[in-house]
C-alpha cells in the first residue's frame, strides 16, 4: 500500500464538515491510518510550505493555514497520491468537478478545503513533517 498526506484546512474545521470530507476519503477506498488535529504556528506553516515561499500567495496561504486548527492525516491505499489528488479536485473550486471534495465543499481558491501530497517522494517528506513512525498504524 502507498501513502499520502492529507490536510483538512481551517475552513473544513470551522464549517464542521470534517466527517463529510472523511466520508469521501473512505468511500474512495483510502484508509485513514493516522490523524491528529493541531493549530499550526507561523513557523510550522512557513516551513511546510517553503516550496511556495517566492510565490505571490505565500503570505496569504500561511495566514490562512494558521488562522484555525487543521487536521493532518496519513492516507493509505493503492496509488494513494494519485487517487487522493483526483478526489480533491482542481485547486480552484470553480473548475473542480462535482463529486470531488473541492467541487462539492470548497468556497474559494483560498479556502479550498484540503491539501494533498503531489508525489510519492513529497508524501514521505510531508508525512515525516507531522508524524513519527509510532503514530502511523497500518491495517
Swiss-Prot record:
Catalytic activity, reaction form: a 2'-deoxyribonucleoside 5'-diphosphate + ATP = a 2'-deoxyribonucleoside 5'-triphosphate + ADP; a ribonucleoside 5'-diphosphate + ATP = a ribonucleoside 5'-triphosphate + ADP
**Residues reported in the UniProt entry to bind ATP:** 9, 57, 85, 91, 102, 112
- Where is it localised? Cytoplasm
Q: Which cofactor does it need?
A: Mg(2+)
**UniProt keywords, alphabetically:** ATP-binding, Cytoplasm, Kinase, Magnesium, Metal-binding, Nucleotide metabolism, Nucleotide-binding, Phosphoprotein, Transferase
Q: Name one GO biological process term.
A: CTP biosynthetic process
Tell me the superkingdom of the source: Bacteria
Q: Which GO terms describe its molecular function?
A: ATP binding; metal ion binding; nucleoside diphosphate kinase activity
* Intrachain S-S bonds: none
Cellular component aspect of the GO annotation:
cytoplasm
Q: Does the keyword Ligase apply?
A: no
Q: Where is the signal peptide?
A: none
Q: Where is the active site?
A: 115 (pros-phosphohistidine intermediate)
Q: What is its EC number?
A: 2.7.4.6
Keyword field contains Transferase: yes
Q: Cross-referenced SMART domains, in alphabetical order?
A: NDK
Q: Which SUPFAM superfamilies match?
A: Nucleoside diphosphate kinase, NDK
Class in the EC hierarchy, top level: transferase
Main location (coarse class): cytoplasm
Give the function comment from the record: Major role in the synthesis of nucleoside triphosphates other than ATP. The ATP gamma phosphate is transferred to the NDP beta phosphate via a ping-pong mechanism, using a phosphorylated active-site intermediate.
Instruction: List the HAMAP family hit by this protein, alphabetically.
Output: NDP_kinase (MF_00451)
Which family, according to the similarity comment?
Belongs to the NDK family.
Oligomeric state and interaction partners are given as:
Homotetramer.
Protein name (record): Nucleoside diphosphate kinase
Instruction: Name the species this protein comes from.
Output: Neorickettsia sennetsu (strain ATCC VR-367 / Miyayama)
Amino acid at each position: 500500500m502507498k501513502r499520502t498526506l492529507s490536510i483538512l484546512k481551517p475552513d473544513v474545521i470551522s464549517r464542521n464538515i470534517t466527517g463529510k470530507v472523511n466520508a469521501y476519503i473512505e468511500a474512495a477506498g483510502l484508509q485513514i491510518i493516522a490523524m491528529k488535529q493541531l493549530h499550526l504556528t507561523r513557523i510550522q506553516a512557513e516551513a511546510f510550505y517553503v516550496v511556495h515561499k517566492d510565490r505571490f500567495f505565500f503570505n496569504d496561504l500561511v495566514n490562512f493555514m494558521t488562522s484555525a486548527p487543521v487536521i493532518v492525516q496519513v492516507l493509505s491505499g493503492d496509488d494513494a497520491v494519485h487517487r487522493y489528488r483526483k478526489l480533491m479536485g482542481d485547486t480552484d473550486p470553480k473548475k473542480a468537478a462535482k463529486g470531488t471534495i473541492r467541487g462539492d465543499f470548497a468556497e474559494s481558491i483560498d479556502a479550498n478545503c484540503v491539501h494533498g501530497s503531489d508525489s510519492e517522494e513529497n508524501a514521505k517528506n510531508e508525512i515525516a513533517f507531522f508524524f513519527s513512525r509510532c503514530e502511523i498504524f497500518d491495517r
